[in-house]
Amino acid sequence: MTIKIAVLPGDGIGPEIVAEALKVLDCLRSDFGLAVETEHALIGGAAYDAHGTPFPKETLELCRAADSILLGAVGGPKWEPLDYSLRPERGLLGLRSELELFSNLRPAVLYPQLVSASTLKPEVVAGLDIMIVRELTGGIYFGKPRGRRINEDGEREGYNTLVYSESEIRRIAHSAFQIARKRNRRLCSIDKANVLECTELWREVVIEVGKDYPDVALSHMYVDNAAMQLVRNPKQFDVMLTDNMFGDILSDCAAMLTGSIGMLPSASLAESGKGMYEPIHGSAPDIAGRGIANPIATILSLAMMLRYSFDDAVSAERIGKAVQTALDQGFRTADIASEGTVEVGTAAMGDAIVAALRAV
């Protein structure tokens, strides 16, 4: 069977880092016989510039027809003055919603070669391996009513709605428990059940779902404490289950424990197993076009795609080993460079990983 991948480079550094992931994909195709086809489409600011919308119909149709999606990044200051409905990020949110990509997997793994790049002491972060499972299509980012208005005192007022249904919570909880079963069988659910009724329900439903997974140790933590614990003792966590907004914040916090946000991939999955894969970092418009962006997160996103959407653990492990080898050889992009390493650009890092892949 030939895998069909929709490629959405997006904005900023997106096209540069996606190009390196495609080098790796081409190597898997030419050297290891992976049957794969790719087709490109626009999303985000690039799509708005070309079509007047951040999420063109053609892009949605391509993504629906594809087996999986590889995304670069969206957004940038150029499009910030636009109406909220036309901003690049709305294209990404629309894609998640249309394809029902409800389960966002964000690993935070510290490579042994990069322990010194973390802002925390080596004894605190060495061996870090956390998986954050974030609900992606509900919560305050999608809740209605939302908007801005003038209140009865004549003041401007903004309002959003935090809402989750029982079925939405149950669905993401099952996803998190299943992932925990494949790891170290520990799941910590993050909420604010002491002040928010929505997350009080979240905790109740997670406890109910947990009864189906007696082999997984379930714990609960308020989000403010979770943020503190990620800095104080991050290795206490295995799998963290969060709602949309809490996960958005905590996953970036966890990412910086690893030394660079440029190292971390993510997966957004539908119940069918179809997924969208992207680095967790943004479009970094300040370095776009300079050839210095770190492509590793995007390359590892490709590895996650092969593992989670196509059950191809062999190819995923080949990519992971190739990344490890390139790091062992001392290659570093600017964001992870340190004394005694070889600082290289985006393309050179991609080339080093491809060379290591061929030698695996």
From Swiss-Prot:
Q: In which pathway does it act?
A: Amino-acid biosynthesis; L-leucine biosynthesis; L-leucine from 3-methyl-2-oxobutanoate: step 3/4
Q: Write out the catalysed reaction.
A: (2R,3S)-3-isopropylmalate + NAD(+) = 4-methyl-2-oxopentanoate + CO2 + NADH
Cofactor(s) this protein cannot do without? Mg(2+); Mn(2+)
The principal localisation class reads cytoplasm
- Give GO cellular component annotations, separated by semicolons: cytosol
Enzyme Commission (EC) number: 1.1.1.85
Question: Where in the cell?
Answer: Cytoplasm
Q: What does this protein do?
A: Catalyzes the oxidation of 3-carboxy-2-hydroxy-4-methylpentanoate (3-isopropylmalate) to 3-carboxy-4-methyl-2-oxopentanoate. The product decarboxylates to 4-methyl-2 oxopentanoate.
The entry assigns this protein to a family as follows:
Belongs to the isocitrate and isopropylmalate dehydrogenases family. LeuB type 1 subfamily.
Q: Protein name, please?
A: 3-isopropylmalate dehydrogenase
Gene designation per UniProt? leuB
